[in-house]
Amino acid sequence: MSVLTPLLLRGLTGPARRLPVPRAQIHSKPPREQLGTMDIAIGLTSCFLCFLLPSGWVLSHMENYKKRE
């Protein structure tokens, strides 16, 4: 990298830094029904079963996939 690289990069990104970033006006209401412990447990269990269990199975059987028969 040359000595001029930081100066060139600063010159390219300088105008972008001065642009105003619009803020989102997000307002929400409180939930109609509070989630119970059982609802949360069912949701976390289903996420675990749907996402983590298949990927764990694939990772645990990685050696079987590497073998050529």
Curated annotation (Swiss-Prot):
Pathway where this protein functions: Energy metabolism; oxidative phosphorylation
Mitochondrial intermembrane topology ranges = 61-69
InterPro entries found in the cross-reference section: Cyt_c_oxidase_su8, Cyt_c_oxidase_su8_sf
Superkingdom of this protein's organism: Eukaryota
| One GO process term, biological-process aspect | mitochondrial electron transport, cytochrome c to oxygen
Q: Which SUPFAM superfamilies match?
A: Mitochondrial cytochrome c oxidase subunit VIIIb (aka IX)
Post-translational modification (record): In response to mitochondrial stress, the precursor protein is ubiquitinated by the SIFI complex in the cytoplasm before mitochondrial import, leading to its degradation. Within the SIFI complex, UBR4 initiates ubiquitin chain that are further elongated or branched by KCMF1.
**What cellular component GO annotations does this protein have?**
mitochondrial inner membrane; mitochondrion; respiratory chain complex IV
Where it mainly occurs, coarsely classed, is mitochondrion
Topology with regard to the membrane?
Single-pass membrane protein
Protein family: Belongs to the cytochrome c oxidase VIII family.
Which protein, by its recorded name, is this?
Answer: Cytochrome c oxidase subunit 8A, mitochondrial
Q: Which organism is it from?
A: Bos taurus
The gene from which this protein is expressed is: COX8A
